[in-house]
From Swiss-Prot:
This is Large ribosomal subunit protein uL24. GO terms for cellular component: large ribosomal subunit. It comes from Nanoarchaeum equitans (strain Kin4-M). CDD domains: KOW_NusG. The keyword Zinc-finger does not apply. The lineage of its organism: Archaea, Nanobdellota, Candidatus Nanoarchaeia, Nanoarchaeales, Nanoarchaeaceae. One of two assembly initiator proteins, it binds directly to the 5'-end of the 23S rRNA, where it nucleates assembly of the 50S subunit. Part of the 50S ribosomal subunit. Belongs to the universal ribosomal protein uL24 family. GO terms for biological process: translation.
Amino acid sequence: MLKIRNYNPSDWSPSWVRSKQPRKQRKYIINAPLHRRRKMMRSPLSKELREKLGIRNVPIKVGDVVRVERGNFRGKEGQVIDIDPKYYRVYLSLDTDRQYPFHPSKLTIIKLDLSDKKRREALKIDDSKYEELKKEGLAI
């Protein structure tokens, strides 16, 4: 889990471009404002979705169905029930009664929740494509 020990929002700069140094990359993520960090919480799409949409990853959203790719729950599928941008974690409902936190990079989106019109516009999905994805079981 990310330690927020030296959290100082004034250290974050929107004009920061990139760095090879891992400590600066970590500093950028830790000190980012929550609305920016929320956009950074992205997960890769499944191969079928990637072929259909032509994009590799999207910001994760409550309602998406995902598959766990790493850890003890590898291979399990669940629905996203909560997102915590402060600790950079996504909570899933798996077979058990508990909610488990996962890092978004360790998940693959299987079904997109496209009920939100703004999300469809952001992903450039028109109504006909949305209906096609729904028919194939790739969208909710």
